[in-house]
Amino acid sequence: LDFAGSADGLILAVAPGVVTWSGPLRGYGNLIEIDHGNGWVTRYGHNASNFVSPGDYVKPGQTIALMGATGRATGTHLHFEVLYQGRHMNPARFVPGRA
């Protein structure tokens, strides 16, 4: 799910968890991946700058990155993914007003 935004807009963690990836990854550009436990993972892509590192614990609402257009992106936005047990879920189900 892509969220349009302004350059350097704040990206916040949606739930508590441990950062498992923070850095460039293929078309995602600068990516952050957070393991929330019980098989749940979120990904935040195309970031201008990442503020967290693998192994960091994050809290819900914590600023983890700045929005950008790195990787295969046509403009500034956040690419948001939700995975459960390694399978992509529809992230709109988890975003209020988007279901």
Q: Model-found features: residue ranges?
A:
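Catalytic cores of peptidoglycan-degrading enzymes
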Residues: 1-99
